[in-house]
């Protein structure tokens, strides 16, 4: 091993240690954080109310789902049953299916249960989008075409591109920022891994944001970057004058009558910046209520929570921008043909999924420890929801 290689590796280890990635990878798994990462993180509590809404169980449970065969476009699952797929290679912990406001399928594996919290990772981005829509409705954020520096004026001195970057660019992953999402431990990916590690485990996220560079002009292309949702979360806090957890509690968790409190990771007690990009942990049943809100076009039991227009812009089927709008997906993101009854979904690493199909009045939630085929779970849910039994 030559001297240059030793110096590079030493610098890498020191940098990783400085942002606690070694602690993170030991605690959360050797290839990134796991669904119980909140147990090792500083976090804020998202309080719920005192009158919870509970989904009733349907008289007729959909037991036929376990034996239904489906065909996946990927190489891992050519022809298999749902039960085989979920218990085989994906390490699923729980699946919940709700139709017409009633639970028709609920199953848990291992020590997971209905009242156990799990980190939903990038599903948090979709919840951050919901909060942004509420802030727009309330006039705290004037318009999604406002530039970022209207809310983070300290960035004006950093790079002229900041004054071209809009909230819409953040919502649609068109920021132009030089940031890559990766959990690869290969040395050639060190620079990108280090940036992602700082986002997950660093103690001063605003310092990381101030140090960002641009690789292209905002709005030029779609490129998935967790940092964009983190910046959006900071904007929401600045615009509302509220901590993320408090605003989410008041505007979503309490009005939606969540059964349990949730939590969101923060960078540190000193700086108290929420992990808006992927730090929310909650129960499956409460996550399903976000789906119910979107299914009902922003209305919860007769009360308007967010505008129908915001829901429309987030979820209407479109093939541009890789099927991604306002932090929600449709299956055109993987090149799948549009089904007769298309849904939309929020997606987190390791296959955390909140899927909604408005045509079938369906909500599906999956929590798991891995998903070896990208978008396999959403694809499975799309196939399932288009089955004639629904």
Task: Annotate each language-model stretch with its function.
Residues 259-260, 265, 312-363:
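Active-site Gly/Thr loop motif
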Residues 114-115, 191-268, 275:
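Catalytic-site signature segments of enzymes, centered on catalytic residues
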Residues 228-235, 276-299, 352-368:
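Active-site-proximal alpha-helical segments within enzyme catalytic domains
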Residues 1-27:
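Bacterial Sec-dependent N-terminal signal peptides
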Residues 101, 119-144, 170, 232-236, ...:
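Active-site SXXK
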Residues 20-36, 346-390:
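Structured C-terminal helix/loop/strand segments within mature extracytoplasmic catalytic/sensor domains
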Residues 18-112, 141, 176, 210, ...:
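N-terminal leader/targeting segments and the immediately adjacent pre-domain N-terminus
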Residues 138-178, 211-213, 239-277, 282:
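Active-site helix/loop module of the DD-peptidase/beta-lactamase fold
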């Amino acid at each position: 091993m030559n001297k240059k290689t030793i110096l590079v590796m030493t610098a890498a280890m020191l940098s990783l240690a400085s942002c606690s990635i070694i602690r993170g990878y030991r605690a959360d798994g050797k290839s990134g954080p796991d669904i119980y990462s909140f147990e090792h993180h500083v976090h804020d509590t998202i309080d719920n109310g005192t009158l919870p809404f509970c989904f009733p169980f349907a008289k007729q449970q959909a037991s036929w789902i376990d034996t239904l065969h489906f065909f996946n476009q990927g190489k891992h699952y050519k022809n298999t049953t749902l039960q085989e797929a979920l218990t085989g290679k994906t390490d699923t912990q729980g699946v919940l299916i709700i139709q017409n406001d009633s639970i028709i399928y609920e199953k848990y594996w291992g020590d997971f249960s209905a009242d156990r919290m799990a980190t939903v990772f990038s599903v948090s981005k979709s919840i951050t989008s919901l909060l942004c829509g509420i802030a727009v409705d309330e006039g705290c954020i004037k318009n999604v075409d406002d530039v970022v520096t209207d809310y983070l004026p300290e960035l004006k001195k950093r790079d002229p591109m900041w004054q071209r970057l809009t909230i819409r660019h953040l919502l649609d992953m068109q920021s132009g920022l030089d940031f890559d999402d990766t959990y690869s431990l290969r040395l050639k990916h060190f620079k990108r891994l280090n940036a992602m590690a700082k986002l997950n485990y660093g103690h001063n996220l605003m310092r990381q944001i101030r140090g960002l560079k641009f690789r292209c002009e905002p709005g030029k292309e779609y490129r998935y970057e967790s940092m964009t949702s983190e910046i959006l979360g900071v904007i929401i806090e600045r615009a509302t004058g509220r901590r993320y957890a408090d605003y989410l509690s008041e505007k979503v968790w309490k009005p939606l009558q969540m059964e349990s409190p949730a939590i969101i990771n923060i960078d540190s007690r000193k700086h108290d910046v929420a992990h808006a990009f992927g730090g929310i942990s909650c129960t499956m049943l409460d996550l399903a209520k976000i789906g119910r809100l979107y299914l009902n076009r922003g209305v919860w039991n007769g009360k308007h929570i967010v505008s129908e227009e915001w829901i429309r812009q987030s979820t209407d089927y479109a093939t541009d921008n890789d099927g991604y709008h306002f932090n929600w997906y449709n299956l055109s993101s993987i090149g799948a043909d549009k089904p007769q009854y298309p849904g939309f979904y929020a997606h987190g690493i390791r296959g955390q999924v909140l899927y909604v199909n408005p045509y079938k009045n369906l909500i599906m939630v999956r929590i798991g420890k891995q998903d070896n085929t990208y978008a396999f779970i959403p694809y499975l849910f799309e196939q399932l929801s288009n089955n004639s039994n629904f």
